[in-house]
């Protein structure tokens, strides 16, 4: 708390203000410094209304905010918090919230609104006046338009702009006369709002450049990373809750392919092995001359008949089981 010293008496309202700021700084886990220097009063009130339920915004003198931040850092034993003052700029204000820094930045960015450009300001982009009626009756405004280089004339009883015209290019200074004309035409080339200077969370201070991300690009990178990690897990056979089913299915398919290729018969591969053998038989028969084939084979070759799937006689099953038992058990256990 600020203590009044004999040689320099501090105004009571300043002490109260610093204490109120300290209370605000201690009330939330996320503290942000924002720049509101160029925000007109009307837009500022609109922004306040938009964010009122999500965060607390408090304006004060920079010297008092600096004092409050430093005292809170000292009282809480948190020197990292004191570094927030390094991001303070003209027209700064404090925001206290529980919203994470990225969501806070997005919310503030979305709360920005278009505004008229001021005379003497630097054009943020090429400012163009479109052709068409201004809706204004003949009068002095016609001369004002022409004075700033906008081709205008009376059209159907109203002042109209003859053609599209770029009146100032990006980076150029907007004259006072042009600013008045653009405002009268309701052209708002400037976006105003609360700009993030620094956001403190758990010992880390984020700047606007840290928080300004392309969401589509960011999500795309996460999806790509997930796909790469998923494929690595499957191919390296490192089971996780997300990949175990795919790994088991891949192992099953690989084992089944080996079984079919090596003609190792199981209840899961018998049909595929028979189908393959049948197809090979038809292919070989097709290479033989007609004299070597009976009528049945000739008919099957000409019709491209599919391999028949026949049920084995009951009495043959016992013998098949004996043959399977004599085969290597390892492969059969996979099915």
Curated annotation (Swiss-Prot):
Basic and acidic residues: compositionally biased ranges: 314-325
Pfam name, any one: Ribosomal_L10
Any one Gene Ontology BP term: ribosomal large subunit assembly
Stated name of the protein: Large ribosomal subunit protein uL10
Protein's UniProt keywords contain Ribonucleoprotein: yes
Alphabetized PANTHER family for the sequence: 60S ACIDIC RIBOSOMAL PROTEIN P0, LARGE RIBOSOMAL SUBUNIT PROTEIN UL10
GO CC terms: cytosolic large ribosomal subunit
Gene Ontology molecular-function annotations: large ribosomal subunit rRNA binding; structural constituent of ribosome
Binding partners and assembly: Part of the 50S ribosomal subunit. Homodimer, it forms part of the ribosomal stalk which helps the ribosome interact with GTP-bound translation factors. Forms both a pentameric L10(L12)2(L12)2 and heptameric L10(L12)2(L12)2(L12)2 complex, where L10 forms an elongated spine to which the L12 dimers bind in a sequential fashion. The proportion of heptameric complexes increases during cell growth.
Chain's role: Forms part of the ribosomal stalk, playing a central role in the interaction of the ribosome with GTP-bound translation factors.
Organism: Methanococcus maripaludis (strain DSM 14266 / JCM 13030 / NBRC 101832 / S2 / LL)
Family the UniProt entry places it in: Belongs to the universal ribosomal protein uL10 family.
Keyword terms: Ribonucleoprotein, Ribosomal protein, RNA-binding, rRNA-binding
Chain intervals for the UniProt region annotation (Disordered): 304-335
